[in-house]
């Protein structure tokens, strides 16, 4: 029976994907004179996170342990939003954590901004700005009115009371405020009293009442000894107009990054993505010929669709802030996106080499490849959902769904991890659309064209050529060696951790991280001493690095525990370093502060996320493979996963890299990816059990299934490792340590995943079954 595909299906699908790729990357906009109207958003409209664009991430908490109500937190959120808008900062993300009474704010720096002063922005945004007019000159004088009775405030410059011109703030009261101010000034004028104006605890002005003021207006002037500047009155007017906070705020943690540093990072990650895609395209075409080439077309559509979901291409989906780990998720999805195509292509090749016709091979290959594709990708979806639920905004869908798991920790809102989970989830779900539907439509269409019906184009051997007999590896027979090796490997990793030590990042322990750029070389001991004296800390850790692409050298200074630093203290550090080392030209790149309590919560939440993901994966495997002993198989798969997780952990230890959010993201990704490989093997075992029944022993069944799955598992891992390898190389060249310490351990974990999926999980399952049967006998 001839395939149901039509040639027009191939042509139409290719054209649709090409059009979609073009519009997703470049968008659709029309320019009339100086006005540009955007109809479809493209890659240029993507909102980039602070790690790319530069900006601030800060967490505010009530001062002095104040227990804020939910209504007060919402009121504080509104005030901060008003202040951000007044600062012309509209591309921000602000979340309220009702569990820990905190407000988490992230915003990129303004385009074209040259003076990057995040400390000033944080101070202005977090200032209580409680405006009061009081009788007398004391802060506890009788209240006349407060900021809620001010209708508007405006920064002005001009003569005041007939004197020389100066900067001042002009106030216009509400009706209630006008009456209160009129009554007070009428009374105080008769007694020769004074009125003082206070902003929080600061006395900004005190004046004698020389007349009754009943016109509903007033001005705030400065003292002769400390005149207002233009910046002072503009800032004060903004704060008054945006309203006062219902309680005082303290900065619990914050981090900043220089815009130019992020721009270099973006260039590096885009380059890594292009190279990874090109390498995978060459590999897929070489291995699978026509299906491999068509798979690459579908993969291009998948990448474009991922960008479309991020940029706001689809009006029904809001644009999403893209971070560097988010881009890493897209690149990883490129590698993993070929999985469905590899499974299908391998199945088609098997059917052709078994003697089936092209149409029969396509039909059988598509049918038999669907189940393992679905089962394998579900595990990745589980991991992505856990990432988004644990580290996303509290009002997000997955955060609400998983609130029962993480409620005790509050929404940590680790935007970088959340972005990674989002792009990973989007990529995997789109893999079903493009890797299954689009690829199969194109293959069916190609198979209906006479010139493309040669079975050799789909992986068949040349006519008359006898397929080389595949050598069966006795994986199960070597189980004792495999299990012994895994045990020794994990023991060695534990020993390395004890000897070398495990370093926790300030993200987990709390503290500060300062990143500086410098020129030429220096004596580490001299810089260590100068930095310790400037910052007043003896617990500093210094680490140097280099951006090979830009030639910029970097110095990271870590302060542990409860120690944090301000921008003024960083400036003191820079002055001291440049004074003692004038040839090095030290300059600030970024600053990060995390409270010890917040770091501990983040670590605890991360560990719970890993355990919860393991439980979900075990439950899924137990359910899907219950006919062949799914619970036992699931436990053995989880046991094998420990090997992979230990490899990731060991890589961090050997690199002397601190455990941070990247470590947790890598661990969770390995959970989903490695179990994906194992699930594909288990699916073969289930299929072969149905075909062979009791004709084969469990050991023979497992060994046969592992041999059938080995090629697919290795090839899929090779494509993903290629993508990660490119990320490692490019991140090293550009000095992106955060990306390298994510990609390299992940790559090692995936290589371990091939080994454990083929050699450990199934071997442990057989060993367990033998022991169980021996007890019965």
Language model features by range: what are they?
Residues 1-777:
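A structural signal for conserved, well-ordered secondary-structure elements
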